[in-house]
Structures are given as structure tokens and as C-alpha cells.
Amino acid sequence: MKKTLQRGFTLIELLVVIAIIGILAAVVIGSLNDARSGGQNASIQQSMANVRSQAELVYNSSNYSYTSVCTDQRVTDLLQASLDVVNGTGAINATSPAWSTSTPSGRSVACQSLDTEWVAMAPLAAGDGFWCVDSTGFSGATTTDQTFSASNMDCR
């Protein structure tokens, strides 16, 4: 009689391997979501840094006045890009030097400009607050949705 060796895995061994793969996949997917949110925040921060640069270009080309910063097409395009990262939808209709746009998700972008100063704010991803830039050179996170006025034109 000839003995034959049977090689292979039992059903239990296969189920254990599948369970381990599932646990590892859950950990990796959780890390990927954090990385995605961080990438979205970096995109918003860069768009807002570009708003600051564009505001200075508008200032230099508008007889040294910030009044038209919030109605400048390039500024509104950058703010729209920030809004699209968070919401995927929403439209900015900047017809005055002071405006705010809310979206169906409740997040908003705001911009206000006067002759000597300006401020803009956009929401960060995943409800992490807002990123605000202003004419004083400040660029940073704020935790609340601020209302800007002629007497309150900075992010701090």
C-alpha cells in the first residue's frame, strides 16, 4: 500500500487568514481616511495662501486699494476651489466687496474687503474648523465661523 501525502490548508486555517487580512485592511482604511482629510486640508491651505498672494496683486493693480479683492475673479476661483474640496458643490457669486456663501452641508466661505484691508475664510475638511487669511499677513486655523465687518477685519 502506498501512502499519499495530502497537502493543503484546512477550512479553519483559511478562515483565520481571511480574518487577519480583514483586520489589517480595517486599520489601513482608517489611516487612509486620515491621510485623505489631511490632504484636503493642505489643498485648502494652499488655495488660501494663493488668495493672499492674489490680493497683493489686486492691491498693486487697483491704485493701492484692497476694495476689489473679494470681487476679483482669480480670488473667487481660489475660494471656490477651497469650497469644492470640502463640499463638492456650491457656487460663489461675488457681486460686492463683502459676501458669504453657504452650502447645503452648512459650511461657508466668506470674504470681505475694504480700501485698506481684507479678510477671507474657508472651511477645513471634516469639520476641523476654518482656515483664515487676512491683510495683516495672518494665515491660520480658527475654530469658529466668524462674521466680518468694517470693525472686525482680521482672523484673530
Where are these regions (language model features)?
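Surface-exposed intrinsically disordered loops and tails
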Residues: 88-108
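Conserved hydrophobic/amphipathic alpha-helical signal-anchor segments
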Residues: 26, 30-94
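Short, surface-exposed interaction loops/tails
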Residues: 114-156
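A generic fold-level signal
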Residues: 6, 43, 112-115
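N-terminal single-pass transmembrane signal-anchor helix
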Residues: 2-32, 36
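Aromatic side chains
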Residues: 9, 59, 66-70, 118, ...
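Processing junctions and N-termini across compartments
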Residues: 33, 64, 104-105, 126-127, ...
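Long, domain-scale functional regions
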Residues: 67, 101-122
